Amino acid sequence: MFFPAIVRRLGILCAISLLAAAILAGWTTVIPARAQELDIELESTGRLMPDVGPGVRAIHRDSKGRYYVLTAPGPSILVYDRDGQLYRHIPKEPSKTTGIVYGLDFDMDSEGDIYVADRGTDTIKMYDSDGRLARSIDVPAPNSIAALPGGEIAVSTTTSRHLITIYDANGNRLRDFGDFVHVTQRPDVNRNVNAGRILTDPSNFIYYAFSYLPEPTVRKYDRTGHAETELSLQTIEFEPEAQARRRYIADQEDNSKPVPLREVINAIGVDPKSGDIWIAIDDELVHYDRDGNRKGLTYRTFTPEGERLVPISILVDPDRLIYACDPAGVYTLPRPDMRPGVAPEKPEEKPAPAPPQKP
């Protein structure tokens, strides 16, 4: 269900206050008109897989409609049927060598093979469609993973000098791409700010969502590393916090201690048919079409009981969104683009041009 966010969010009044503060502060940022619109509450239609809760890391669906869920720590991926009933584990009987120690992310290819980024062993574990461990390759500090055709895998790590590294099925590094955004002079902090998550679509485009960049940003690459589009949310609803984050990071320039960072983008999902992109910033949800045009409003997501939903993974089904939230669990939400009479969905903002790649 959709409800104007009047009680839980001040909406227009808040936007007007922020706009006034921006003007008084002398900001010169151009404020898009959509930033002054009223946010819409998006209420979950119910919970799936009630045994999934704290530690959930990612969710995927196969061609037969089965759902695969990764939790950490946990030795196996949980497999559920279309009705949300658990019926299988991958691997079926995990051992010290075949089990998952601390999986941060996973993906599936078109053949049903599964790839797990296991931070606990600094490896990528590959399971065949029957759930057997096929092979394991060493990758230091894997953070996120996406399966590509021909057995290739795209990986983000916390040690690479690029955003994305492509490996072949045997663990050979094929290519690196994706330049960092320069935010601070401290190399360690700048590397952490550029950490992110990877996702692919059926057309084999690769999406990189910056987890900690002050401005919510997603880049879209083709599988060779050519940058197609960059989506950067620089509206009045996100700009004040982005400015505050940049000031906080700048204040740490002369500090040698580790700098804790708060997540900005916590999840993204891509519609496998349309290529539309859904981006979650805390409990807020925004929508772009495949060409990077902003669609509709900003949505605030809640459980039926009124608790905020902050996803760590988003699955886009034909008629609904599925949120995997740590620790809340897995919830279904209506797709606002399927309810145009209630929550208008229209193209709005054009994407920023993709940044040039360094030779």
Model-found features: residue ranges?
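Eukaryotic scaffold repeat domains enriched in small/polar residues
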Residues: G26-P359
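Bacterial N-terminal signal peptides that target proteins for export
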Residues: F2-L18
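Hydrophobic core
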Residues: L18-L24
